[in-house]
Amino acid sequence: MEQLNNPFVIYGYKGTEYFCDRKKETDLIMKALQNERNIVLISPRRIGKTGLIHHVFENISKQEPETHCFYLDINATRNLSQFIQLLAKTVIGKVDTFSQTAMRKITTFFAGYKPTMSFDEMTGIPTFSITVSPSQREDSLKHIFEYLKQSEKRIYIAIDEFQQIAEYPEDGTEALLRSYIQFLPNVYFIFAGSKQHMMTDMFLSAKRPFYQSSQILNLPLINLDEYYRFANRWMGTRNLTMDHDTFAYLYNKVDGQTWYIQDILNRLYQNGKEITTAEIDDVTLELVNEQEVAFVNYYDSLTDNQAALLSAIAQDKAVTSILSQDFISRHNLPAASSVSLALKTLINREFIYKYNGSYIIYDRFFGMWLRKNCAGN
């Protein structure tokens, strides 16, 4: 694993030594997969869901080198065909030892879908893509899963932002996937998602195909004390120290959200100054100001009612009863019906979400910017 100049990783997964805690969740997911259980992983964005998946897969690869682990993020897919093409590119050819015989076998197996082989520029590993016409969608998906089944290899597949399949225009996508997945004797899945209400409905509603098909894990925040020990250990490599109260100030400033903590720690480590609450405030303000152009564009894209509601939620930080007369009157908001309509739009656009019973601004830095610039608007 590469040695990093800054141990506080903001993007991607860089290995176990740079990964904080999650021992309990890692063990739970690994045991589920190893005991033939699919698992659902639910958390808001920026809590560390994707990093945890890669951490689990790294641990599995060390313990079970013959097991194949695949990760695909389907957030950008808009229909079943795009899902199938991404799945094909992710898995086809990756469970075979590279040889001319294996490549011919794959080409023959997927002959009806015009398979094309290319080589990854970074790794040199062959990658296959297939062409799927609308009439071939169901058959092509069946072929991919049959290919995995016939490999007789143990396979774990993580599908991130899995709730996206509910947005596809094709009818019956969930039922189609479920019908194939349940009969795979050697393939087990992590279904991960950031939209809690959609994921919960998909897996806990008796009317949905994936009902009671998987173990559920709602990802909690990283424990403050564990995070403190991790942060202080790495700060010590640069002769920096941070007392527990100072770290707790940072942790609570961003509600324990992993990505924001990492972003601030990364900058504190870079600066190399004495770590105080004042330094944390300075670094946080710097990070917020760096994104001001984006925040102005977000705000300007809203209607007056949406902007007023977003600002009101930012001022209160967390709102339990958003349609209450007290909240509406304190912030001079329009009628409850207008607030309800604005709320729906803000949720759909992922400006806000409901967490532990309260509505919160999704982007913590955007919330800070709103409190600073839009108070009373």
Across the structure, where does each feature detected by a protein language model lie?
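Conserved C-terminal helix/linker of AAA+ ATPases
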Residues: 247-248, 270-291
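A short, basic N-terminal segment
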Residues: 1-39, 44, 59-65, 353, ...
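Alpha-helical DNA-recognition elements
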Residues: 59, 176, 267, 345
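C-terminal leucine-rich, beta-strand-based interaction scaffolds used for sensing/assembly
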Residues: 2-8, 293-377
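Conserved Walker B catalytic segment
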Residues: 127-195, 204
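P-loop NTPase nucleotide-binding core
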Residues: 42-47, 51-156, 337
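C-terminal helical "lid" of AAA+/P-loop NTPase domains
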Residues: 247-253, 259-273, 308-311, 344
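Helix-loop-helix "sensor" segment of P-loop NTPases
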Residues: 201-252, 274-275
